[in-house]
Amino acid sequence: MLVSSHLERLLVFVFEFIFIEIGFPPCTPRPVSTSSKGVTIESSHSDMATSSLHFASCDTQQAPRQRGASTVNSSSSTKVDLKSGLEECAVALNLFLSNKFTDALELLRPWAKESMYHALGYSTIVVLQAVLTFEQQDIQNGISAMKDALQTCQKYRKKYTVVESFSSLLSRGSLEQLSEEEMHAEICYAECLLQKAALTFVQDENMINFIKGGLKIRTSYQIYKECLSILHEIQKNKLQQEFFYEFEGGVKLGTGAFNLMLSLLPARIIRLLEFIGFSGNRELGLLQLREGASGKSMRSALCCLTILAFHTYISLILGTGEVNVAEAERLLAPFLQQFPNGSLVLFYHARIELLKGNLEEAQEVFRKCVSVQEEWKQFHHLCYWELMWINVFQQNWMQAYYYSDLLCKESKWSKATYVFLKAAILSMLPEEDVVATNENVVTLFRQVDSLKQRIAGKSLPTEKFAVRKARRYSASLPAPVKLILPALEMMYVWNGFSIVSKRKDLSENLLVTVEKAEAALQSQNFNSFSVDDECLVKLLKGCCLKNLQRPLQAELCYNHVVESEKLLKYDHYLVPFTLFELASLYKSQGEIDKAIKFLETARNNYKDYSLESRLHFRIQAALHLWRKPSSD
């Protein structure tokens, strides 16, 4: 009972910390899977031939003909052979990457209840649509599709007696007991389980769904561990299988992605997860994904896209901002060649340009990403989010407002965050410009609290943060107390200063804005928010100065915040986040031991503040990178 209780709570933590913490739709075409630690696969591609990425050779134009040729009448119960399932799923992936989303679904739909790979591909696209739209009907459709997919995969799994079912897969007998088709069924079943678990968490916030979702993750995790052992056995005995490379690709994708995702979690959560058998190893995860990417399986592209998501998105939001742009560019190059107008490919291309500091180029690519297709508006919303931030970085406030307004009107992902950002951006404009928009800033801030939502039983951290900040405009107060630089504060929360650090001109312009706010504060009458506002300005000023290579002045700003700790009344998050910035500053000056000491102080001495989990993610990433040299 104790283990079950731990399992329930800890698996909820996994989703709270990874799926919820990012607070924005994922950028990869499918959720990631599970892993095992301590089993290192010797790579036959140790040099990670990122230039040797293999795409499915199937011609997307031949999809209808192939479907008719490779299968039998759908009215029969005949199973589709493994070769046909793999080929058509590869074609569907190419269609998806070419923005032909409906074509991909229609190719897979007729055989989704007969073929495990048709079922996996079809349900994955439906689930992705549900996650991106956040419409309740789409979520229900996704759950239904994934339930059917699990039933289809179950048809192909090896059947065992009641007695045998009490033992693990490998202890039931020798490797020869599993046919090649049954091995693939295990991989497909594990992938479907994990996706269904994700939707179970999103669907409702009751405890029963928590337990159901947690057990699905646990089962998926165990299947991947067992498949990894099978993979090693096949390699050891040099057994011949026609589609071994596809099975290997599935194992590398699942174990690699799960290793990578679990390694991101704060140390205290990892220790608890290890108690019930979970573990994560970042180097092993990246190695497995790189090996999968350099293979020729259908999942090679998915391994690449997972690494790209890690480098271009996760490393920035949940990390230190130290991104392996070079590897991201190498991985993306063959995608750009084969899918030059693919929305997902263009999105990654724009993200890479953004991380390099090429904001103008990124802006153009994001706009192109919007223009190339109308079928899935959800990709537009991803681009609007990025375009909004680019304009914030450039302080083009009216244009930033335009994109924030589009998000408020069209996207359901986080209305509270969108409305808060719209109000925050309007707060940066002169009053006459705000009047021209026909918006009321106070009214917008007051709407935030009513728009917050819960996922997996938890509020989104950024929404909770927005709600707390918006309380200064509450109707219960005698008068609103204006927020200071709210758009730049949110920019800091999303690690935007890391991107701006590549551009001296933008950092200088931001410093001017911050110093104007600093001067305005000094001329205002003292109130209960004054110390908090002053400390926020000092933190933002320190970030600008650090980006401009003025470390001594930056350190003075940061120290002011830390020394004001006992005077803060509301924004207690400022001190631990400032300690993180001090650590980053010392690390840039080569004082690694001092930097680590500040990280540990921020991690161990503070709790129950806004965005605590986000900071713990960043601390974990920094400790991982700074304590030893890394080739990531």
Curated annotation (Swiss-Prot):
The TPR repeat ranges on this chain: 343-376, 535-568, 576-609
Keyword terms of this UniProt record: Lipid metabolism, Repeat, TPR repeat, Ubl conjugation pathway
Pfam families xrefs: Iml2-TPR_39, TPR_8
InterPro entries with a match to the protein in the record: Iml2/TPR_39, TPR-like_helical_dom_sf, TPR_rpt
GO BP annotations, alphabetical order: cholesterol homeostasis; lipid metabolic process; negative regulation of cholesterol storage; regulation of cholesterol efflux; regulation of cholesterol metabolic process
Disulfide bonds: none
Function recorded in the entry: Regulates high density lipoprotein (HDL) cholesterol metabolism by promoting the ubiquitination and degradation of the oxysterols receptors LXR (NR1H2 and NR1H3).
Database matches in PANTHER family: TETRATRICOPEPTIDE REPEAT PROTEIN 39 FAMILY MEMBER, TETRATRICOPEPTIDE REPEAT PROTEIN 39B
Family, as annotated: Belongs to the TTC39 family.
Protein name as catalogued: Tetratricopeptide repeat protein 39B
Organism from which the protein derives: Macaca fascicularis (Crab-eating macaque)
